[in-house]
């Protein structure tokens, strides 16, 4: 019998418990696995906070995930850094809001290594970061999170920023899609295995939406 996402993720607790575990994980500098709806992309992303991001964590994203590392930012932060959309007309099925890619102007070599990508992310997200400190294009791909978070758009981007806000961290995070060893996209069963191998909590975008609604009541 094929189990659905709810059944597979239940081993990590109730939706509220899963969010609370994820909050604790990112506060402690660890990662989480975030799944979107089965009817949407039905994929899982490895996520870290920008506050605690390390080169070792970035290397795991590059080695065990798709390697396309994205930086989730609020609309205000993206505007402040003058990050224009990657394209004028977004034809993405899920309207993923990529901006032009970035690179730190200082402290990097080619920009592609794990250490260089962390430097770029830290440069963009530090207090007082300025647009002229970033070169464009680069090897880090910023994403704009919709205002309102997962209650507005049920994407990994919004889930990442919402989770960091719930954890009282900088409202920005890094994500990368988890892939299988054969190069295909990992689905929920494979995400669960990956999480257990790396001792990471699992939650869904829907969990975050339910948590936010409950806490607002």
From Swiss-Prot:
Belongs to the DHBP synthase family. D-ribulose 5-phosphate binds at residues 40-41, 45, 153-157, 177. InterPro entries: DHBP_synth_RibB-like_a/b_dom, DHBP_synthase_RibB. It comes from Aliivibrio fischeri. Binds 2 divalent metal cations per subunit. Magnesium or manganese. Keywords: Lyase, Magnesium, Manganese, Metal-binding, Riboflavin biosynthesis. This is 3,4-dihydroxy-2-butanone 4-phosphate synthase. Homodimer. The record marks 139, 177 as: Essential for catalytic activity. Its cofactor is Mg(2+); Mn(2+). GO terms for molecular function: 3,4-dihydroxy-2-butanone-4-phosphate synthase activity; magnesium ion binding; manganese ion binding. Pathway: Cofactor biosynthesis; riboflavin biosynthesis; 2-hydroxy-3-oxobutyl phosphate from D-ribulose 5-phosphate: step 1/1. Disulfide bonds: none annotated. Pfam families: DHBP_synthase. Catalyzes the conversion of D-ribulose 5-phosphate to formate and 3,4-dihydroxy-2-butanone 4-phosphate. GO terms for biological process: riboflavin biosynthetic process.
């Amino acid at each position: 019998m094929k189990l659905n996402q709810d059944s597979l993720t239940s081993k990590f607790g109730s939706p509220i418990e899963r969010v609370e575990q994820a909050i604790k994980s990112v506060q402690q500098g660890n990662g989480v696995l975030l799944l979107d709806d089965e009817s949407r992309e039905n994929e899982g992303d490895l996520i870290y906070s920008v506050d605690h991001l390390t080169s070792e964590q970035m290397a795991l994203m590059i080695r065990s995930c798709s390697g396309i590392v994205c930086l989730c930012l609020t609309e205000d932060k993206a505007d402040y850094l003058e990050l224009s959309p990657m394209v004028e007309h977004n034809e993405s099925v899920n309207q993923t809001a990529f901006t032009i890619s970035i690179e730190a102007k200082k402290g990097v070599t080619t920009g592609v290594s794990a250490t260089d990508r962390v430097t770029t992310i830290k440069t963009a997200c530090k207090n007082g970061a300025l647009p002229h400190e970033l070169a464009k294009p680069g090897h880090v791909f910023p994403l704009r999170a919709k205002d309102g978070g997962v209650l507005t758009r049920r994407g990994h981007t919004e889930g990442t920023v919402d989770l960091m806000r719930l954890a009282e961290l900088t409202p920005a995070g890094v994500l990368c899609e988890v892939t299988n060893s054969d190069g295909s996209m990992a689905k929920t069963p494979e995400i669960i295995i990956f999480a257990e191998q790396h001792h990471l909590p699992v939650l869904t975008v829907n969990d975050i939406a339910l948590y936010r609604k409950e806490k607002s009541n």
